[in-house]
Amino acid sequence: VHLPDILHDLRTIIQGAVYSKKQDFYIDTEDMLHEDIITDRLRLTQVLLNIISNAVKFTPVGGMIHVGISEQPCGKEGYTMVIFRVKDNGIGMSPEFQEHIFDSFTREHTVTENGIGGTGLGMAITKNIVDMMGGRIQVESEVGKGTEFTVTLECELSGMTTKPESAS
């Protein structure tokens, strides 16, 4: 999987919603060392698209969504830990809701009060996919301040290619 292609596809899919809400949408690959990894492209795209779509949905007009990719060594030859972060300055979540965000049919009461649609299945499905990929998903949030989701996956490197150095 060529990560820049996935990021381009995600930006293309989400740009209409971002534009209609006049949001700022950033993708930061500065700390991404390897562009090519071996993983399930469809599942990775589904996970990231669901998290980013929620960020757009729960971030008000004029808000900001930041997607970052970084890496950490995992101590296994030919593998790396890829860390995907999606951070927004949206409505946020209560600590109580964060404990149940990955349960099926779970929705925050402020969401239902504000009339924001959804079934409460998206994050349960997302966690299930991340688990099947052998990864980890975490959430940090504060009501009224925003939310950050972090997905960490151990990925095999594809051909040991590294990101080209930018000219300084």
What is each model feature region?
Residues V1, Y19, D24-E35, Q72:
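Conserved catalytic submotifs in the C-terminal HATPase_c
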Residues G117, G122, T126:
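Short alpha-helical Gxxx[C/S/T] motif in the catalytic ATP-binding
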Residues G16, I91-G92:
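Glycine-rich G1-box
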Residues V1-T12, D24, T45:
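A conserved beta-strand-to-alpha-helix junction within the catalytic ATP-binding
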Residues A55-V56:
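Short helix-loop "hinge" at the ATP-lid/N-box region of the Bergerat-fold HATPase_c
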Residues L3, G92-H100:
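Short helix N-cap motif at coil->helix boundaries in the Bergerat
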